[in-house]
């Protein structure tokens, strides 16, 4: 069960953090239409059933369940080509750009299950103000739900993972954040609150404000701006 439902109470009140590690798809940007088109096209080409429950997992993990082992690399390359070519309809989610740019460069990173070319294509297509540190599936031996991606993000910022906030929209990412020893915030939209096991669950990033203080980052939960 989630530790907190959609909040009126900020369960993180009184705590400070050193950095924020953001998931990308479904958290900062909405690429769902493009993802659905690309994976549907791939599934038709390869004669497999499209998995609608795979959000937040690396493409390799999904594909390994669907195609013979000797064709996995070929299948991954094809999915990546389809996804990188289709960046239409990708939008920045409410509050995401403002929250990202409110943080100092040394205290923010994106940690995504995308390959780097795909992450860069989607960020460029949406004109999102990307941070300097972006960890992709290409940078770690294991992807979400293993802790490796968030451990790598913390290491690149020079921060103890236990002092990091992870902001995610998917169960696999939240599991990875917890396994890395981070505090987790979930945003609803991709999944309902009941499926998000996090320290705090909010309806969107426009419900959050992060104050930068000499002692660290302080999380404030606010009503979304209309």
Tell what function each PLM region has.
Residues 1-18, 101, 107, 116-226:
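Asp-based, Mg2+/Mn2+-dependent phosphohydrolase catalytic module
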Residues 111:
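Glycine- and other small-residue-rich loops at beta-strand/loop junctions that grip anionic moieties
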Residues 3-8, 13-107, 115-117, 128:
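N-terminal helical cap/lid subdomain that shapes the substrate entry/recognition surface
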């Amino acid at each position: 069960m989630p530790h907190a439902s959609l909040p009126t109470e900020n369960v993180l009140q009184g705590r400070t953090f050193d950095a924020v590690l953001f998931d990308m798809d479904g958290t900062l940007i909405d690429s769902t239409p493009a993802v659905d088109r690309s994976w549907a096209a791939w599934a038709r080409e390869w004669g497999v059933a499209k998995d609608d429950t795979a959000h937040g997992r690396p493409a390799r993990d999904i594909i390994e369940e669907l195609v013979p082992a000797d064709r996995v690399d070929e299948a991954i390359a094809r999915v990546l080509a389809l996804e990188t070519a289709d960046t239409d309809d990708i939008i920045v989610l409410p509050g995401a750009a403002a929250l990202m740019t409110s943080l100092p460069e040394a205290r923010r990173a994106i940690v995504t299950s995308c390959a780097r070319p795909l992450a860069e294509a989607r960020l460029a297509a949406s004109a999102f103000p990307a941070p300097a540190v972006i960890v992709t599936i290409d940078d770690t031996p294991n992807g979400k739900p293993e802790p490796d991606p968030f451990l790598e993000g913390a290491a690149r910022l020079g921060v103890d993972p236990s002092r990091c906030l992870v902001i995610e929209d998917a169960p696999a990412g939240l599991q990875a954040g917890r396994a890395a020893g981070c505090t987790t915030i979930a945003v609803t939209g991709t999944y309902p609150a009941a499926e998000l096991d996090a320290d705090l669950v909010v309806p969107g990033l426009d419900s959050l404000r992060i104050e930068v203080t000499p002692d660290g980052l302080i999380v404030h939960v606010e009503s979304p701006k209309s």
